[in-house]
C-alpha cells in the first residue's frame, strides 16, 4: 500500500481501520498531504486479534504510536469514540452507517420469517439463533456470507432444520431490502468477544429500523 501511495497523486488519504493506517500516515507525512482515519471497529479489540496475543501486541504498539498523531478521525459509534478518547485522548467524530431514507411500501407477508443479514462470522450469535429455531414456529432467512457459513450449514443439517433455516447467500442491496421489508423481525445479536463487539453499532441495526421491523 505504501509504495502505491508514494507513486500516486492525491490530496487526502482516507485510511479505513488500523491495518491501513501505517502506510497512509507515513505516505501523507512524506508528501505533506492530509489524512483522515476511519475506524469501522475497535481494531485491537476484535476477536481475531484477542485470540492471537502476540499479533495483537504488535497492533497495540502501532495504535499507541499512530493514533495520537492523527488529527482527523471518524468512527461509527459514540462508544468507540469515547473508548479512543479515554485511552489515547484523541477526538473522533461519529458518522453512523445509516441507510438513505425511502418511503416504505405496504408489506405483503406471505411467509412469516426472521431475518439475519450481514457477515457470517464468529460472535454474531448465529449458532444460538439457529438452535432457537427448534422451538420457534417461524422460518429463519440468513442473508450473507463469511468464514463460518459451512459450519452453520452443517449445524442446520445436524439439527434437521433445513426446512426452517434458509441460506440466501449474498444479495445485492435492492434484493436484500425486499427481504428486510418482508421480515417479521431482524436478528442483531453479538457475543461479547471483545470491546469492539461490545461497542458495535451494526449497519443492520439501522437497516431494520429503516424498513420498519423490530
Question: Where are the predicted features?
Answer:
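Donor nucleotide-sugar binding/catalytic pocket of nucleotide-sugar-dependent glycosyltransferases
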Residues: 44, 56, 60-105, 165-167
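Short acidic alpha-helix that forms the nucleotide-activated donor recognition element
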Residues: 65-68, 134, 150-151, 172-184, ...
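Short His-centered aromatic/hydrophobic patch
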Residues: 15-20, 39-40
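Membrane-proximal helix-turn-helix segments that form the acceptor-binding/catalytic region
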Residues: 2-9, 22, 26-30, 37, ...
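A short, histidine- and acid-enriched strand-loop-helix "catalytic/donor-clamping" loop
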Residues: 10, 36-53, 72, 102, ...
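Conserved donor-binding/catalytic core segment of Leloir-type glycosyltransferases
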Residues: 74, 106-133, 137-141
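Nucleotide-activated donor-binding/catalytic signature segment of Leloir-type glycosyltransferases, i.e.
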Residues: 143, 151-178, 185
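Acidic donor-binding loop of glycosyltransferase active sites
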Residues: 71, 180-199, 211-214
Amino acid at each position: 500500500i505504501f509504495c502505491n501511495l508514494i507513486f500516486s497523486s492525491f490530496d487526502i488519504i482516507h485510511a479505513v481501520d488500523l491495518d491501513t493506517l501505517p502506510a497512509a500516515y507515513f505516505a501523507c507525512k512524506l508528501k505533506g498531504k492530509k489524512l483522515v482515519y476511519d475506524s469501522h471497529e475497535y481494531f485491537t479489540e476484535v476477536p481475531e486479534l484477542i485470540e492471537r496475543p502476540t499479533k495483537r501486541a504488535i497492533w497495540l504498539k502501532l495504535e499507541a504510536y499512530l493514533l495520537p498523531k492523527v488529527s482527523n478521525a471518524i468512527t461509527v459509534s459514540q462508544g468507540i469514540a469515547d473508548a479512543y478518547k479515554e485511552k489515547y485522548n484523541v477526538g473522533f467524530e461519529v458518522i453512523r452507517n445509516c441507510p438513505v431514507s425511502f418511503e416504505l411500501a405496504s408489506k405483503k407477508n406471505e411467509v412469516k420469517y426472521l431475518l439475519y443479514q450481514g457477515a457470517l462470522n464468529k460472535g454474531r450469535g448465529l449458532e444460538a439463533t439457529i438452535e432457537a429455531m427448534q422451538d420457534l414456529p417461524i422460518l429463519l432467512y440468513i442473508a450473507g456470507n463469511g468464514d463460518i457459513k459451512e459450519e452453520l450449514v452443517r449445524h442446520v443439517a445436524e439439527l434437521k432444520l433445513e426446512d426452517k433455516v434458509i441460506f440466501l447467500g449474498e444479495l445485492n442491496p435492492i434484493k436484500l431490502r425486499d427481504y428486510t421489508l418482508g421480515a417479521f423481525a431482524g436478528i442483531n445479536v453479538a457475543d461479547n468477544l471483545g470491546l469492539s463487539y461490545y461497542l458495535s453499532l451494526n449497519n443492520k441495526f439501522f437497516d431494520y429500523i429503516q424498513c420498519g421491523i423490530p
